Amino acid sequence: MIVNNIFSRILFGILASCCLLACRGELPVLPSDGIEVGKDPLGGVHIKGMYLLNEGNMGSNKCTLDFYDSTTGKYHRNIYAERNPSVVKELGDVGNDLQIYGDKLYAVINCSNFIEVMDVETAQHLGQIDVVNCRYITFSNGKAYVSSYAGPVGIDPNARPGKVVEVDTTNLAITREVVVGYQPEEMVIKDGKLYVANSGGYRFPDYDRTVSVIDLKTFQVIKTIDVAINLHHMKLDRYGRRYVSSRGDYYGTGSNVFVIDTQTDRVTGSLGIAASEMCLSGDSIYMTSVEWSYVTESNTITYALYDVKQNKMVSRNFITDGTEAEIAIPYGVTVNPETKEIFVTDAKSYVVPGYLYCFSPEGKKRWKVRAGDIPAHFAFTTKTFQ
């Protein structure tokens, strides 16, 4: 009898486990408790929170996704793994861009060669777009546009030109592609034209120095604008000017930000400011720079604020309380478009978890929290985190 009773309990346990496993897909997502960091004291109306993509060091497969819920004041780490336990290798190797379009969240996973598409409210996997060595993503009229190095990762003086790929956001199918300059980076869209900054970073020391202009109707390159070597980021202000950052060559030519008039597609000047990362919010460009020099074998770090309406430098350091002394490697910067709170990430040594800092609009530290490895890319959402 005792043996039969034990056997019955074991059998019941096995059947119960099988039942739970069979129903796993129907179970609701249970979010982590999160870490209390503080609610938004300025009370944003529409924005509910912010996603943060942690790049992860190349080759480590440690790209992760975090979420700051400004309605509860809680920070949730590594939510993709939590909400997608069946996805092999989770997010992949080196997250390079993060954007929201409609009800979808798009994470560009550079060295894994795909764009991960998620539900913007739950961060649950919806689909994947395969693009070799993908870099940045932007959107217009139901289409996504992805810049691609179009070849393997690595320095190569004979690296092939890159491309821009068009994707239908309804079915995530690639519809068109066009060849541009070498190692294309960030893009902006204006008046039916897409502008992409070409770096030529793999072709050192023979960098590219152009912006390719694509007609979105024909999807052909209609113009090439000569700007400066090793271009990277691009932002568009409300006055019809584009701001393009150049990394320089890390020797005699320093980093700078160049201004292009959208009416004439000509370079009209430069800001004389180094910029590794840029965020345009209203009439202000926030720029962080970690400018490495092989001559001095050291970094020069700056936190600049520039007024695009008045065309003048506001400050060489938008952090006003001395907190910059805590930050080893400023790696990402963004500004809440409603509250104007400033967010800066610290990559530390690139191989350990970094930190996210929140500053008041006046540049005073509100809080900081540990993030993933190399925290870098942001996306604000008006949707409630489920």
Region spans (language model):
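Intrinsic disorder/low-complexity signature
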Residues: 1-2, 234
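C-terminal motif of bacterial Sec signal peptides marking the signal peptidase cleavage site
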Residues: 19-22
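Bacterial N-terminal signal peptides that target proteins for export
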Residues: 2-11
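Predominantly soluble domains enriched in secretory-pathway, periplasmic, or organellar proteins
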Residues: 24-386
